[in-house]
Amino acid sequence: MVLISDAFGLEISPNGILVGHGDQAVLYSSEPKVELPVQLREGKVRGFAWSSLRKSQRLLLLYSENEYSLIRCTTSSENDLFQLVYEGETRDWINAALFLEDENESEDRKRFVLHTSHSALLYMEYDLTSNADCTVLELARCTDSSILYYTKLHGSSFNKLAIISGNAFGELLVWQTQFPTESDPKSVMKTYPLLLRIEAHNGVIHSIEFDLQSQLLVTTSDDRSVKFWNIQKSGDWTTAEIKPMFSCYGHSSRVMCVVILKIDDRTFVASGGEDSYVCIWSSSGELILKRRQQFGAPIWRLGFSQDAEILYSTSSTGNLVGQNLKEVLNRPKIESTILSSLGDANEFVRNLKFVNNEIIVGLSSLNRLYYTRISPDSSHENKWLMVNDFPSYKRTVLEVFDDIIATCGHRRITLHRYNTNTNDFEQLFDGIRMKGTIRSFQFLSRDRYLVSDNLGYCLLLQTHQLHIESHIALFNNREPWITAALLISEQYLLLGNREGHVMLYCRSSASDDFQLKDSIRYLHGKMGSNFFKLLSLNADNAHVMSGGHEAFLKYLSVRFSDSTLRVSQREGIPLAWVEASPSDDLILGFNDNHIVAWSRRNDILLQLACGGGHRCWDFRLSDGDSQLSIAYVKQKRVYFYRNSLYNAVDNRLKDIEPNNWHVRNCNTLRLITPRNQSDPFILSAGDDNIIKVTQVTNDSLSQRAEMHSHISTVRSLQAIPYKSNGGDSSTWLVFSVGGRSQLCISQLSIDASNKCWISEISSHTLHNVAASKTSTIEARLMAIDVVQHSDGDLFSIYVAGGDGNISHYIWELETPNQLDLKHFVDIQRCPLGIQWIASKGMLLVSTTNGEVYGFDRTLETTYFQLQLHVTGINTIDIYVDRHLLHILSGGDDESIKYTVLNLNNNNVEQKIEYLGLHNAQVNALAIHCPTKSVAASELFAYTCSIDRQIYRIDLSTHKYKRVGYTCIADVKGMLLDEHQRMYFYGCGLQTMSISNIL
């Protein structure tokens, strides 16, 4: 089934890449991936250790929180065979494990050590021949027993084993199993002295790495620092000296992992943090590279393949990402090259464009046109050559499309065509077409152009002779010229001006001129769109992507029937502003003073320091969009950069498909099933402010769409089926609430090919209706439910706010921006959930003080008020059996309550409490009727808690049993679908079949 969970374990070896994914362990190699035979009972895989190879066999030790497993790996010419041979438990958390090569060890026995979080060391031996129990040879303890968060073991024999740990107080602790101070032969227990205690950090130490040859030790911590230490020892570890060198700060959150890299006799340090960034440092502490790798998810582990020189990382979403460092750490290739100057000290390139992969043209400060050829060999210096017979006048615009070069100035336009064979620039046109100073020249195609000037005069020109095709009337603004243009069809033209307005024009039937039909003000603020990209076009509408000076892509919908333009969707991206979208996967833009290339599949591909986005620059993609060339002007000099966008990673990763699940907690989940399909789609939302649409197919997930309408955490959502416009598509209205008192309403359509279309309908801020009219208090909206009226376009929306208000609104699709408050009730407690019972016309409300309310449709009548728990009710599920309402609830009091309410007289007919099932707050439960019968005698329940244990309860006999556990940390809820699948969500997602756990 599906598992998206933390990947805490990562081990790089010649045999492949081992990843601990939740309670599973996967081996990635050049062969198809192998899932190891692991049967952990409660934990997540935290680490691995390999033994040496003997007689084509080796042992793999795998450990979780307090469990460990031994797996025999038999190597053959065809493939490796893995067999689980032993499982064990410890009483304390396991921090590290290591196989040893002691001198008195026999070939049939393997010795290893397990280090636990209170500085205890288990020295054990396993007999390969008998598959018997592991024998404890020694229990070693340190005189210090503080709580340890990370341990690094060093040594090949037990008598010379060094233990370097970091504790919760930021101290670095070192001890060695060589000279015990206390010994108990009966219990094989020995105590060893602490050799070093060093105050290292102002927080928990999360990782330690050292290299004795380089005399370098590195630690990371909660304090966001990467600290370098000098480590020296002349003999055993009693002679060790560790002295601080310097601290490096490049992360904005906790630094969770670190590795030391050796590349071409140079030493580097790589660190990964909760901010999803990987920083690469030189041995002197210089930050060489900072790159976001995991789409915003916290990075838990780093691993380095010395042979392939690839840095791997794992994250909270379970993704494994590899980055080839061969070129990344090659200084000439990660920095821009300064091209030669023009020769005259008073003349410089002030604007430039790529003509092809090798030729760059530049417009000089003296309004002369130059060109240069970029050699593949960086050792060859480029030369700027002046274009002969170039008309002399002051230029304001330089644009290039294929081999056509356009230069413009006051009223005048000049076109040249570059001949790749002769290197000649043929003049195609030179003449006056405009009234003022030309500010914009847009290539709509190779022979159609849109030109605008500072007076608002705009023309659509065609052919290389610039014949006037039509006049276009622009807004009479201070800066009316065009920044982006798209000819959608022969009838429709989309323009964006310098002041931020986007305008839709339609060609007049009486003339060839275009008339303004619709507009959107300040689509990307007051700086205008930088580009339009046509995504789809049919007889009814067109979909267009727009990017500008903000961290969002906007998706526009053009409807031809009434010539209207609207924003259908937005998408948040990790760029300060967007400049171009040259391919489906690639977005180019700026962050602060860097040019950034961002990939939907690979996250940040490039961060090139250029000085900021205000300067003139251009780009070129080549080699199948895999190589990016960038040229820009800085301080009157031209800089050039060229490198591969996508790092070549070895074939061990070629078949790994990364998941696109939430990088923060998932708070709510709903299942929807399109018509004529059996597998459901998942609607999910969480702390990353994103609503995701994910298709479930067999045992895999495929993300289909995202909604970025929320500005804060999404707490709850509902999907209401809505009538579609015929065809095979299915449509839902999605209502969602969360932080900043925001209610968002969107439309989701899924066609027969499973393509999703999102349309953001409206967004509302629901202020406290009891406060003053000038109040700006924004209470978090905790829950929502929606009822569709008999009139299909009219809806009742029930919203529960963190201020204690339950509000009833009327909303109509025809007027989406209007929200009519009908009534509200203040229950004086924070509501945690609401649920509409359609068959009874009743709204069920659960609260933080353990009460459940039943309200009528208008919220004016309270049917009942029951005290079910002594603390908050975190989760609730119901089942209606004629006049009986079955309520199953779980709360902070760690108990589960089963209540049967008679709705005829509102009397409680049965109330059962299940104690002792869980030892943490209960956040997930569901009532299950396996035969789909209405008979309450066949009701069962499944429950889950923060302790991750899953229980099954027979609600008729009240017997229960533990049936499994989930890997999902901080479980927020669970659902059951028609295929008997359970969905657990929280910090990840896990699906499992009921039949597999019974």
Swiss-Prot record:
WD repeats lie at residues 148-185, 200-239, 250-291, 294-333, 476-515, 527-566, 567-608, 664-704, 779-821, 826-865, 868-911. Keywords: Cytoplasm, Repeat, tRNA processing, WD repeat. GO terms for cellular component: cytoplasm. GO terms for molecular function: enzyme regulator activity; RNA binding; tRNA binding. InterPro entries: tRNA_Anticodon_Mtase-Reg, WD40/YVTN_repeat-like_dom_sf, WD40_repeat_CS, WD40_repeat_dom_sf, WD40_rpt. It is found in: Cytoplasm. The keyword Chaperone does not apply. It comes from the Eukaryota. Disruption phenotype: RNAi-mediated knockdown impairs small interfering RNA-mediated silencing and leads to derepression of piRNA pathway-mediated transposable element silencing. Together with methyltransferase Trm7-34, methylates the 2'-O-ribose of nucleotides at position 34 of the anticodon loop of substrate tRNAs. Interacts with Trm7-34. Belongs to the WD repeat WDR6 family. PANTHER family: WD REPEAT PROTEIN, WD REPEAT-CONTAINING PROTEIN 6. This is tRNA (34-2'-O)-methyltransferase regulator WDR6. It comes from Drosophila melanogaster. The lineage of its organism: Eukaryota, Metazoa, Ecdysozoa, Arthropoda, Hexapoda.
